[in-house]
């Protein structure tokens, strides 16, 4: 694969190009961490300065094929804003669009079908307060019951009500949906949730007795939402981009 880094296209704002770079990097990182599902699921980002314009992956590309220039700009209904030969999964954009339009602070919506996330979504009690990783996010998690593959307006309204003002939504029997005030925030919240889910599964498989955390500590964590904060942009996100650049910087094309 060619690794030439592309410069910003003419007539595109610096802010949009930076968002494209971050979103393409996010797709590559989701794949690198093992959370992708062939060409299914998606990560969407709001175009800076545009309330109703968004970037999404071209339908049919694997996550490790997505580049900054291949991302498709669409409106809230899934219509292409700029000419593009690429198709998108317009049906799959219905839920992200609903969230983006209802919550203007949400810059990124990240949806996964990961093994750990799906496995925990199938458990009656969802993510349990078993360890420090879970407690970091436990107060920022909501759940939404599976309603089939349909995307009716009523179903989207119920999903939005369940998410409320939180940033992590367990889609029961389906997967995870994470929102963030930046692409970096959404990715790091996903990392924390995926890590906590994997730890829960590993513990459950061990068959060992659980050493409980006190109710006071769990209660304090439950009342301290942290999942969508922007701090990850300061340290973790640049570090992840450096790692990606060492592996394959072609996402910048």
PLM region descriptions:
Residues 1-253:
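Glycine-rich flexible loops
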């Amino acid at each position: 694969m060619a690794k030439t880094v592309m410069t910003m296209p003419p007539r595109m704002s610096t802010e949009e190009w930076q968002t494209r770079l971050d979103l393409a990097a996010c797709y590559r990182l989701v794949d690198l961490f093992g959370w992708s599902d062939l060409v299914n699921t998606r990560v969407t980002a709001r175009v800076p300065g545009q309330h109703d314009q968004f970037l999404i992956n071209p339908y049919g590309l694997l996550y490790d094929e997505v580049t900054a220039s291949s991302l498709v700009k669409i409106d809230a209904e899934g219509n292409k804003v700029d000419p593009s030969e690429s198709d998108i999964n317009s049906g799959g954009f219905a839920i992200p669009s609903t969230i983006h339009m209802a919550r203007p602070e949400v810059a990124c919506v990240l949806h996964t079908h990961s093994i750990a996330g799906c496995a925990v979504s199938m458990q009656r009690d969802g993510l349990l307060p078993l360890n420090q990783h879970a407690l970091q996010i436990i107060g920022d998690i909501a759940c939404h019951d599976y309603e089939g593959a349909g995307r009716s307006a009523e179903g989207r309204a119920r999903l939005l009500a369940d998410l409320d003002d939180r940033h992590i939504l367990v889609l029961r029997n389906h997967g995870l949906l994470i929102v963030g005030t930046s692409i970096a925030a959404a990715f790091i919240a996903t990392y924390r949730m995926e890590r906590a889910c994997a730890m829960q599964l590993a513990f459950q498989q061990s068959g060992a007795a659980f050493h409980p955390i006190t109710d006071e500590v769990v209660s304090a964590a439950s009342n301290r939402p942290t999942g969508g904060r922007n701090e990850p942009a300061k340290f973790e996100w640049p570090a992840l981009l450096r790692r990606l650049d060492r592996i394959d910087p072609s996402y910048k094309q």
